[in-house]
A protein has these predicted regions:
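N-terminal Rossmann-like NAD(P)+-binding domain of SDR-like oxidoreductases, especially those catalyzing
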Residues: 1-185, 337-341
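Tryptophan-centered motif/residue detector
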Residues: 6, 23, 27, 48-49, ...
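Asparagine-centered polar/low-complexity signal
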Residues: 105-106, 112, 187, 217, ...
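Flexible, glycine-rich phosphate/dinucleotide-binding loops
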Residues: 43-44, 135, 189, 259, ...
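Short Gly/charged-rich anion-binding patches and loops
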Residues: 23, 70, 202, 265, ...
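C-terminal substrate-binding subdomain of Rossmann-fold SDR/epimerase-dehydratase oxidoreductases
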Residues: 30-31, 63, 207-349
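Residue-level recognition of oxygen-bearing side chains
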Residues: 70, 101, 108, 199, ...
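NAD(P)-dependent short-chain dehydrogenase/reductase
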Residues: 138-143, 147, 155-156, 161-242, ...
Length: 349
């Protein structure tokens, strides 16, 4: 699936050992890109990276994204064509326990990316992944548009709003940053995610131990999207704006309205796939989390020719296959399944 645009492009991905970073880096390798990873050494969600043995595909340098010198030194060695910033403290609930680290990783880390491209020769384009939780959420069932106010009622969400504001401020302050695009995506699922307090990973962890999953907010609505959809959208954005000059924009990356679904429905679909009657218990959490989150993706869809999504049951079934192979400890089959699936997905794009 070598892609003419991506062939031999030098791409830095920060946070490459995490769930999304691992999938994205593998897709880019299969597309012909030269990938260079920068990641924190301690990562509790690097199982996909290890299972697919991605260290054999490209080199990862380990450092601290909240330390300017750590990333700047790495960047100067690579001199990338493209920079993708994904490194973050990615958990809402964890931000209550480690608020300062969340701010350091998500805000100062983003500032270090921007400062690095300011003081060095900038890449042609920098893609900064923030989150769909970057908006001020008043639970009004509205679909958030890119022009809506940024903010957050928890430290994680606020940190992503701050990262967006920083990107805009840097762009307006300096003229030598190349092209910068921020993308706001979230509730991404797929095989290989073992993150904390995430619905779908928790489901598979629980049923593998023959235990019920604990659901905090069964009626919460989220914009669920399969891992390869945002990745393909990220690639489309980079390809389109690569040759611009000092361009800035931001996009919501989200699914169609049919995939804005209640938490409990997701679990019931997975139970049906696994022929289970009821795998869950409901226990309310005391910690605050938005109940309703909906994204308006019309800005992106009006600019790009977007592949129509299959129904969410299809993607949950694919996700189920990945975890089934994982818990059967069939590593060779996981590798074959993942690579063949990526090739098939992009062939149909």
């Amino acid at each position: 699936m070598i892609n003419k645009f991506w062939k031999n492009k030098k791409v830095i991905i920060t946070g490459n050992t995490g769930f999304k970073g691992s999938w994205f880096s593998l897709v880019l390798i299969l597309s012909g890109a030269k990938v260079y990873g920068f990641s924190e050494k301690k990562n509790n969600n690097d199982i996909f990276f290890k299972t697919l043995n991605l260290k054999s595909f490209y080199k990862t340098s380990y450092g601290d994204i909240s330390n300017f010198n750590s990333f700047n030194k790495f960047y100067k060695k690579i001199k990338p064509d493209i920079l993708v910033h994904m490194a973050a403290q990615p958990y809402v609930f964890k931000s209550y326990d480690i608020p300062l680290k969340t701010i350091k990783d998500n805000v100062i880390g983003t500032a270090n990316i921007l400062e690095t491209i300011r003081v060095n020769k900038s890449p042609k384009i920098t893609l900064i992944i923030t989150s769909d939780k970057c908006y001020v959420n008043s639970e009004r069932k509205k679909y958030f548009k890119e022009k809506d106010p940024l903010g957050g009622n928890d430290i994680y969400s606020a940190s992503k709003g701050m990262a967006e504001i920083l990107c805009n401020s840097y762009y307006k302050s300096f003229t030598n940053l190349g092209n910068i695009i921020t993308v706001r995506a979230g509730n991404i699922f797929g095989g290989g995610d073992f993150g904390e307090n995430r619905l779908i990973p928790d489901y598979f962890k629980s049923i593998s131990k023959r235990k019920n999953i604990i659901i905090r907010n069964p009626k919460s609505i989220r914009p669920w999207q399969y891992i390869l959809k945002p990745i393909s959208n990220y690639m489309m954005v980079i390809e389109k704006f690569y040759s611009k000059k000092n361009y800035f924009n931001n996009f919501n990356i989200g699914p169609g309205k049919n995939s804005h679904i209640e938490v409990l429905k997701i679990i019931k679909v997975l139970d049906k796939i696994n022929k289970l009657t009821k795998s869950y218990e409901i226990k309310k959490s005391k910690r605050k989390e938005s109940k309703i989150l909906k994204l308006d993706n019309s800005k992106f869809n009006n600019l790009f020719s977007v592949k129509k999504d299959k129904n969410i049951e299809h993607y949950l079934s694919l996700t189920n296959q990945w975890y089934s192979l994982f818990y059967k400890k069939n590593k060779k089959e996981i590798v074959n399944f993942t690579i063949n699936h990526i090739k098939s997905y992009f062939k149909d794009s």
